[in-house]
Structures are given as structure tokens and as C-alpha cells.
Amino acid sequence: MNSSRFLYRSRQFWQAISTRSSQQDVELVSSILSPVQVELFQRMQKSEQFHSLVVLNELRNRGEDNTDLLTAALLHDVGKTQAPLRLWERVMIVIVRAICQDCVQKWGTFKIDHPEKGLGWRRAFIVAEQHPAWGADLAAECDASPLAVSLIARHQEKIHPEVSSVDDNLLRKLQSVDDNN
């Protein structure tokens, strides 16, 4: 891990233990999400809410105003509410990804019907790999648009560089900001 990535992860760690939402954040979220979607957003851990707000604000700073994209920015990690990660589990995922990306994917593909029950040491990897699908299901239950649901479901998916549908272009924008924050 290079020094800039280490500093980035250190900043993320500090934010995970010290974040608080402002009234302005609450108003911004409420201006984009429906009341039931706001409730879903509020179920996320504070650090996940903060991350989602950073992703949202970066997209807006880039001039993005597509409602589906902004909804996905706020709810892309909502699947993690199914089995909230502890701080040490987040750290473990980062370390293992740095050493063996394929291991995270392999260990995380184990089929699980009840994520809240966990699976011992695999639990964190399962959440890391499967939260997009869980989040898409939750967003769909809260009447998010099909495009927002698709963006949430696919936010960790690798996109072929030659594909240029409107949906994939929005997904690239979400992934770019999410990956850097």
C-alpha cells in the first residue's frame, strides 16, 4: 500500500469513528430521497452515511443532477445494514484486498440467506461482496426507480470499457467517485 493510499485509509478510519450529520446534510438527503428512503438511509451506520454524503457531494460538485444517480449515491451501501460491519472487519477487508483481491471475492461469494446471522470469519467478506444485491433489494422495496436500483446492484461490477449505454455511463460516474472516497 503506497503512502497516499495509507493516508486515505487513515482518514477513512478517523471519519468512521468521529462522524456526525449536520442539519444541512439531513435537509440535502430529504431533498433527494422519499421519506421511506430517508428512513432506509438512516439505518446505515454513521460512517456509511458520511461516505454516501461525500459521494453525493462529489457527484454534485462535478455537475451531476440525475436523480437516479444521486439516489444511488446515497443508498449504494445500504445493503450493509443487513449485517453491519465492525471497525476491525472493515480494516480486515482493506488489508486482505491489498494482499489478495481474489480472496475477498472468493470468500465473499458463499451463498447466505440470512446475513444477520453471519458465517464466522467469512462474514465480513460476504457483506463486502454481497451488499450491492442486498441494497438493491432494499431500495426496490422503498420504491426507488429501476435505474437507481440497478446502479446500487451494480456499483461494484466491472464494466467493459467499450460499453457506453446511458446506464453504464452513470454507473462509471458512481464507481469513480465511490472508489476515490
Kindly label every feature range from the protein language model:
Residues 1-39, 156-163, 168, 179-181:
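Non-catalytic interface/linker regions that flank or bridge core catalytic/transmembrane domains
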Residues 38-51, 56-181:
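Divalent metal-dependent catalytic cores for phosphoryl transfer on phosphate-bearing substrates
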